[in-house]
Amino acid sequence: MNFQIRIVAIADNGQEQVHEITPLQRTELKPATLGLTLAEGKAILGEIQRVVVEQQTAHCVAAHRRCSACGQPRHTKGNHDLPMRTVFGKITIQSPRFVHCDCQPHETKSFSPLAQVLTERTTPELLFLETEWSSLMSYGLTAELLQEVLPMDSPLHASTIREHLCNVAQRLENELGEEQWSFIEGCQRDWNKLPPPDGPLTVGIDGGYVRGRNKEGHFEVIAGKSLLAFRREAGEEEELSGKCFAFVQTYDEKPKRRLFEVLRSQGLQMNQQVEFLSDGGEDVRNVQLYLNPEAEHLLDWFHVTMRLTVLLQTAKGVPEKIGEGEEQYELRPKVLKQLESIKWYLWHGNTFQALNKLQDLEMDLDAAACDSKDENTRKLLKGAEELRTYVERNQKFLPNYGERYRNGERIASGFVESAVNQVVSKRMVKHQQMQWTQRGAHLLLQIRTRVLNEEWEDTFRRWYPGFRPQTQEQPVKKAA
C-alpha cells in the first residue's frame, strides 16, 4: 500500500500550488508498521514546514517588489541566505535586498524585507520550548529530548540552549523597573478611598545554597512564595495558587522591586494586609521592608523551635549532677526544665521572661562548665548564648504564636521549604553535580519561577503577537 501526501497552497487570488510530500509505503500490518513512525512523522513535518515557509516568504517578498508610493518595480541589489531555526528543522531562506525608489527620501539606499520582519534567527515556538524545558531539566537533557522528538537536521548543543535562556532571561531583567528604597505610595486618606482588598497575602522567604564554579564554594539563593488567602471576585471554580520567586542575593541589584512586582501581580493594594515570615536574617528582612503600609513582619516559629530542639538534644548529654559531697547539685534536670520554660515563654511571645530565663541558664551553665570541664556543657553554653543573641535581635518580630495558632493563622513557613525545594533543589542541587555562575543561576531562576507560576506562555504572547492564541483550555500544571 502506497500513500502520497500533498500540500496545496492557495494564494489570495485563488491560484493553487500543489507540492508533493515524501511518499509512504506499507506492506503487511504489524504493530511496528501501524501508522507513522517517529522518523516518518519528523520527515513529513519538516517537508511541510519547508513548503509553508517558502510560500510565506515568497508572499512577503512579492509585496515589496514594487514601491508603495509610485508603484514602480524596485531593483534587486542581491540575495543572501537567512538561516532560521524552527521547531521542525533549520531552514535557509533566500532573502533578496531591494533598492529604495527615488520618488521619496529614505535613510538607507536598500533594504531587505525578510530581514526586517525576521529579526531573530530562532522562531518563538522553538525558543519557548528550549527555555521552558531547560528550566525544568538540565541543558544537556533538554538538547537530547528536543533532538529526539523534533525534526532537527543539525545537532543541538547544550551551550546553545544555555545562551538562548540567558538572552531571554536578560530581556526579562531589562523590563524590570528601577529599584526603590520604598514602594509605599500615598497616605492614609488615599488608602481609605481604595476598594476593599482581597484576602491577606502571606509571604515566606528562605534561602538555599548552590555550588559555584572555579572553586568559589557555594553561594546563597533566596527563594520564597506568596500565598493569597482569597479573592473577592473569584469564581467558585477558580483555584488560588501561590506564586514563587527567587534570586541570587549577591548578584541581583533589584531584589525589592522583584518581590514587589510578584505581590502586585497578585493584586496587592496599599490597604491590603501582608504577612512576612522569615528566619530573621537581616538581608532577607531588608527585602521585605517598605513594600506595604499594612505589612506585618514575623519570625518563623520553625527557625525558633529548631534552635531550641538542638539545645534540648545537647542538654541530654550534660552530666546529671555536678560536684561532690555537700557541694553536689543537679544540672541536667534543671537545664531541661529551664529550656522547656524558655520555649513556653517564646511560644506565647513573652520575650522579656524568655530572655531572663536564658540569662539564668547561661549563669548556671557557666558555673557548671568551670566546675566539671564537661565538653557538652560548654557546647550547650555557647548555644544558649547564641539563642539569646538571636532572640534579642528579633524580639520585636516574635508574636504570640499560641494565639495565632488557635486562630488558625500561619506561624511557620513550611510552604516556603517546599518552594525552595521546588525552585532551587530539584533543578540545581539534588542528584546533579552541577556548578553555577551567579549570573547563570540567577537568570535560570527567573525563567523557572515564571514557568512554575504558569506565566511563561503569557510572557511570550506579550513579546510575540500571534504566538499560541489563548484558548479556553486550562493550562497543564508543571510538576518539576
Report each predicted region and the residues it spans.
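Short recognition patches in nucleic-acid-associated and regulatory proteins
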Residues: 73-91
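Short metal-coordination and nucleic-acid-contact micro-motifs, chiefly zinc-binding Cys/His arrays
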Residues: 56-66, 80, 93-96
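Short cysteine-rich clusters marking metal-coordination/redox-active sites
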Residues: 67-70, 100-101
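Charge-rich, acidic-biased intrinsically disordered regions
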Residues: 66-68, 191-192
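N-terminal helical hairpins
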Residues: 51-55
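Catalytic center-proximal scaffold of phosphoryl-transfer enzymes
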Residues: 1-47, 95-98, 102-480
